[in-house]
């Protein structure tokens, strides 16, 4: 994938960059693998906003992606197309299985149409093949990783993401995740060889507010410019300070650096090293 840069012939195009979509081979999805996508606009069943700054966006259909590769064990499949998916940054690949079934999977980097892949404990270590973690050699890059065997992949699914197999001991396999966290997984958990495609997704510059609106993202208003009835940071004359020991959410809970993880979370036993710390305070400590 490459990034296309434009000449600044309008203000909205000056900072704009887009993917060149070089890996895409068709612009029409497999109709049997799509369904309607109802946009809930961040509301619950009562119409109350539960997730702020959501709403609008371009109409789209949801592509049904197969995250449980182990459900098609020992059945070879040929990569038919690589397609754009409006619901995620990663591309998706359409597989034609030898038994006649069609399924979408996340498109691994460098996987091209015509390649034959398979999910099997005895599959070769090649990009696109899925194997149990216990069968994957140390140092191999993987993605689309299961947390619970047979439940389907839940980790390492974002565009450009990959984890690395760093150790094996008994029934557990140690992976280094994209966040820097080192974590234990059951050796029966399936993972796909390689890195998720569209690795340049993080380098795309939207260039204007309208492109965020196309994605269904609404403006983010700072609490300090609200009225006190709307946010604890609001009110005062001019640019007033927060007036509290630290920043809080609209509901008065501490935020920006405040730890919210449960102290007795069961998965703590599987985490060898916590992820890298992110410093949100450094990017303007009053944005809640």
Swiss-Prot record:
<dbReference type="InterPro" id="IPR002171">
    <property type="entry name" value="Ribosomal_uL2"/>
</dbReference>
<feature type="region of interest" description="Disordered">
    <location>
        <begin position="29"/>
        <end position="59"/>
    </location>
</feature>
<feature type="compositionally biased region" description="Basic and acidic residues">
    <location>
        <begin position="29"/>
        <end position="43"/>
    </location>
</feature>
<dbReference type="GO" id="GO:0015934">
    <property type="term" value="C:large ribosomal subunit"/>
</dbReference>
<comment type="function">
    <text>One of the primary rRNA binding proteins. Required for association of the 30S and 50S subunits to form the 70S ribosome, for tRNA binding and peptide bond formation. It has been suggested to have peptidyltransferase activity; this is somewhat controversial. Makes several contacts with the 16S rRNA in the 70S ribosome.</text>
</comment>
<dbReference type="InterPro" id="IPR008991">
    <property type="entry name" value="Translation_prot_SH3-like_sf"/>
</dbReference>
<dbReference type="Pfam" id="PF03947">
    <property type="entry name" value="Ribosomal_L2_C"/>
</dbReference>
<dbReference type="GO" id="GO:0016740">
    <property type="term" value="F:transferase activity"/>
</dbReference>
<dbReference type="GO" id="GO:0006412">
    <property type="term" value="P:translation"/>
</dbReference>
<dbReference type="GO" id="GO:0019843">
    <property type="term" value="F:rRNA binding"/>
</dbReference>
<dbReference type="InterPro" id="IPR005880">
    <property type="entry name" value="Ribosomal_uL2_bac/org-type"/>
</dbReference>
<dbReference type="InterPro" id="IPR014722">
    <property type="entry name" value="Rib_uL2_dom2"/>
</dbReference>
<feature type="compositionally biased region" description="Basic residues">
    <location>
        <begin position="272"/>
        <end position="288"/>
    </location>
</feature>
<feature type="compositionally biased region" description="Basic residues">
    <location>
        <begin position="210"/>
        <end position="221"/>
    </location>
</feature>
<dbReference type="InterPro" id="IPR022666">
    <property type="entry name" value="Ribosomal_uL2_RNA-bd_dom"/>
</dbReference>
<comment type="similarity">
    <text>Belongs to the universal ribosomal protein uL2 family.</text>
</comment>
<keyword id="KW-0689">Ribosomal protein</keyword>
<dbReference type="InterPro" id="IPR014726">
    <property type="entry name" value="Ribosomal_uL2_dom3"/>
</dbReference>
<dbReference type="InterPro" id="IPR022671">
    <property type="entry name" value="Ribosomal_uL2_CS"/>
</dbReference>
<dbReference type="GO" id="GO:0003735">
    <property type="term" value="F:structural constituent of ribosome"/>
</dbReference>
<dbReference type="InterPro" id="IPR012340">
    <property type="entry name" value="NA-bd_OB-fold"/>
</dbReference>
<feature type="region of interest" description="Disordered">
    <location>
        <begin position="210"/>
        <end position="288"/>
    </location>
</feature>
<keyword id="KW-0699">rRNA-binding</keyword>
<protein>
    <recommendedName>
        <fullName>Large ribosomal subunit protein uL2</fullName>
    </recommendedName>
</protein>
<dbReference type="Pfam" id="PF00181">
    <property type="entry name" value="Ribosomal_L2"/>
</dbReference>
<comment type="subunit">
    <text>Part of the 50S ribosomal subunit. Forms a bridge to the 30S subunit in the 70S ribosome.</text>
</comment>
<keyword id="KW-0694">RNA-binding</keyword>
<keyword id="KW-0687">Ribonucleoprotein</keyword>
<dbReference type="InterPro" id="IPR022669">
    <property type="entry name" value="Ribosomal_uL2_C"/>
</dbReference>
């Amino acid at each position: 994938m490459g990034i296309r840069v434009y000449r600044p012939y309008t203000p909205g195009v000056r900072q704009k960059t887009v993917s060149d979509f070089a890996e895409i081979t068709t612009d029409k999805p497999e109709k049997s693998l799509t369904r309607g996508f109802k946009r809930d606009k961040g509301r619950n069943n009562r119409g109350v906003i539960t997730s702020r700054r959501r709403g609008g966006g371009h109409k789209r259909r949801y592509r049904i992606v197969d995250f449980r590769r182990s459900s098609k064990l020992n059945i070879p499949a040929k990569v038919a197309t690589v397609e754009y998916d409006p619901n995620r940054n990663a591309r998706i690949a359409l597989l034609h299985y030898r038994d006649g079934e069609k399924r979408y999977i996340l498109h691994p980097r460098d996987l091209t149409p015509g390649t034959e892949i398979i999910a099997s404990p005895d599959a070769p270590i090649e990009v696109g093949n899925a194997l149990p973690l216990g069968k994957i050699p140390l140092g191999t890059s993987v993605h689309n990783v299961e947390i619970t065997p047979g439940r389907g992949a839940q980790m390492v699914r974002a565009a450009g993401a990959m984890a690395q197999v760093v150790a094996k001991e008994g029934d557990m396999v140690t992976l280094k995740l994209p966040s820097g966290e080192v974590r234990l997984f059951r050796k029966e958990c399936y993972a796909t060889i390689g890195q998720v495609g569209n690795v340049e997704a993080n380098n795309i510059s939207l260039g204007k507010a309208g492109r965020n609106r196309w994605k269904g993202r609404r403006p983010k208003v700072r609490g300090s410019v609200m009225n006190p009835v709307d946010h604890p940071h609001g009110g005062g004359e001019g640019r007033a300070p927060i007036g509290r020991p630290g920043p809080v959410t609209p509901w008065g809970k501490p935020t920006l650096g405040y730890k919210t993880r449960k102290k007795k979370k069961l998965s703590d036993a599987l985490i060898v090293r916590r992820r890298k710390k992110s410093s949100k305070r450094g990017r303007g400590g009053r944005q809640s």
